[in-house]
A protein has these predicted regions:
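CE4/NodB-like, metal-dependent polysaccharide N-deacetylase domain
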Residues: 41-50, 105-137, 142-145, 149, ...
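Active-site-adjacent pocket scaffolds in enzyme catalytic domains
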Residues: 131-236
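A short acidic, helix-capping loop that chelates divalent metal ions and anchors anionic groups
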Residues: 97-102
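A cross-domain feature marking catalytic cores of carbohydrate-active enzymes
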Residues: 7-9, 53-57, 91-93, 130-133, ...
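Short, hinge-like loop/turn segments at secondary-structure boundaries
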Residues: 23, 80-83, 107-109, 145-147, ...
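Short low-complexity, flexible loop/linker segments enriched in glycine and/or proline
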Residues: 67-70, 78, 104-107, 166-171, ...
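Active-site beta->alpha N-cap acidic-glycine motif
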Residues: 1-85, 130
């Protein structure tokens, strides 16, 4: 059986946002790419596993002036080294807006295209995209197709995860800490769990799109998600 391993390189600020914690301390701005990435990369390399790293463009954009520029340049260099090793760098949008799928087509295209330009300084071709929050829209597919992407990996057909996420978000809201996360389009919960060509106007259905949808992995029948969160809470 062939297995694809991918990691979303969301900054700590993304996790603060989804848990309603406000903004993190400045010293944590680059902790994922400075500390976690090298450790994870070493773990995979020791097992001879090639990985797809989905990158948020602004975290490696050396053209941005101001505080953190040196760290952003260094972050890009680390990822370029991993690409040289054989890993893949994927597009995870430029700003990681959780509500990206609900924004207008111009903003969606700008987020995809700007991250693509940043990544193009590190690798020759960017083939894949994953939407923030696993929420994809027809406008996203249209942008990806126009930019020549070969696959999207955003559909998450896991009803149990959706229900748990909705419950957590409701609990945070009741506690006065509204989450910055969004719930995905519920139609995605019934999407095929295996790779398929989506319909351009309905990404959760089979169709004739020029790119392939690689859904987030779930188990057969029960559709339990095979993601890091599940592994952390699963019995040892």
């Amino acid at each position: 059986m062939r297995v694809a391993v991918s990691v979303d390189l969301d900054a700590i600020a993304c996790y603060y946002r989804i848990h309603g914690l406000g903004e993190p301390p400045d010293e944590l701005d680059h902790v994922i790419l400075e500390r976690a990435l090298p450790r994870a990369a070493a773990l995979f390399a020791a097992r001879d596993i090639a990985v797809t790293w989905f990158v948020v463009g602004k975290d490696i954009d050396g053209s941005l002036a101001g505080p953190g520029r040196d760290q952003r340049v260094a972050n890009g260099q680390r990822l370029a080294e991993l690409a040289t090793r054989g890993d893949e760098l994927g597009n995870h949008s430029y700003s990681h807006f959780y509500e990206l799928a609900r924004l207008d087509p111009v903003t969606i295209d700008r987020e995809i295209a700007t991250c693509d330009r940043v990544l193009a300084k590190l690798v020759k071709v960017v083939k894949g995209f994953r939407a923030p929050g696993y929420d994809v829209s027809p406008a996203m597919l249209d942008s990806l197709a126009r930019h020549g992407y070969r696959y999207d990996s955003s559909i998450f057909p896991a009803p149990g995860y959706y229900a748990a996420k909705a419950a957590v978000m409701a609990g945070l809201a009741a506690a006065g800490r509204p989450s910055g996360a969004v719930l995905t389009d519920p139609r995605a919960l019934a999407a095929p769990p295996e790779p398929y060509r989506p319909a351009m106007t309905s990404p959760w259905r089979r169709g004739q799109a020029p790119l392939v949808e690689l859904p987030i992995a779930v188990t057969p029948w029960t559709r339990v998600p095979a993601i890091g969160t599940t592994l952390l809470v699963a019995p040892t």
